[in-house]
Design a protein with these regions (language model features):
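Low-complexity, small/basic-enriched stretches
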Residues: 1-83, 154-178
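Nucleic acid-binding interface residues in structured DNA/RNA-binding domains
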Residues: 15-26, 78-178
Length: 178
């Protein structure tokens, strides 16, 4: 579930985090929440995790248990059968369009930044759109895996531009290809 809230959140609102221990071959993940819904999911060694979690309190929440079940299904080699509750703050119309396309990329498949740009251009009645702009929006994604930004590759098939690190991207794509 996406809540489009482009207003700045109350800076005093409590934020929570917990760590998900991934299977061998992947970095562990940090989950973040406002106490009700998932607000972030990143690999622990990513810059986003370091920046986003500075003042988060460790806590066990229902949304974390729900997200753990989703991650267990994912790392178990299956397309998860549900989506954990989440909210994305600061979602512009363009970012929403990009996320909508990302959410439609099936488990085990990939798209290029150009494919996504073409889909959005078509939806908006434009001749073309910048693949670089799409890359910026994909890189902005605060909830990796659930919103599958790792399934996006460069036009020449290059595995580029993944905030969770290229090693994790390679491992995720190989995991989904099995």
């Amino acid at each position: 579930m996406i809540y489009n809230d482009s207003r700045r959140r109350d800076v005093c609102q409590m934020q929570y985090k917990t760590i998900y221990k991934t299977p061998r071959g992947f970095s562990d993940m940090v989950m973040m929440s406002d106490g009700e819904v998932l607000t972030g999911l990143h690999f622990v060694d990513s810059r986003k995790a370091t920046r986003s979690c500075r003042d988060c309190a460790a806590h066990d929440l229902p949304v974390f248990r729900e997200t753990c079940r989703w991650l267990d299904e994912y790392f178990g080699g299956h397309a998860p059968s549900f989506t954990p509750s989440y909210r994305i703050d600061g979602l512009t119309p363009f970012r929403k369009d990009v996320i909508d396309v990302l959410l439609k990329i099936p488990f085990g498949q990939i798209k290029t930044y150009g494919d996504i740009a073409a889909a959005i251009a078509k939806k908006r009645g434009m001749k073309k759109m910048s693949a670089q702009a799409v890359g910026g929006a994909v890189g902005w994604n605060p909830i990796c895996l659930v919103i599958p930004c790792h399934r996006v590759i460069g036009a020449n098939g290059a595995l580029v531009g993944y905030g969770g690190g290229i090693t994790n991207k390679v491992a995720l794509l190989a995991h989904e290809a099995r």
